[in-house]
């Protein structure tokens, strides 16, 4: 498996250099969760806002918590409000606290008031890590609201 994965990574690098979005969309359902994790991150990098829908589907449907976590992280890093619905759903209902935590952080990074209701509800999550992530994310929303600033600083400190 490791050798096959390395060979695939070599091909992935070539496809990355060619910015082949469809290639990485297809890898989002690959049997190897390591490949899916990489595909999520690379698709976010090369596709921008076009990556929101397929990465949101990974966040909702992938059976591996690490892959879903990376999907949440990538949606936050992309920073588009079109990713909020998928992230909010993950905060509310993902079975993994690891994913709920990252989705809450990602909502803070996006920095939109549209996420406030979800983050307020996350303050009552059963997991202390999710609750703490919601506090940090809400602090960023408060800062953005009070300063009317949505800068690189707020994106880096949003979660």
What kind of region is each of these model predictions?
Residues 126-137:
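Solenoidal tandem-repeat scaffolds enriched in leucines and small polar residues
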Residues 1-37, 41, 45:
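N-terminal alpha-helical scaffold/docking segments in eukaryotic complex subunits
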Residues 11-15, 42, 74, 106, ...:
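Core register positions within helices of long alpha-helical scaffolds
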Residues 45, 77, 109, 140-143:
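Register position in tetratricopeptide repeats
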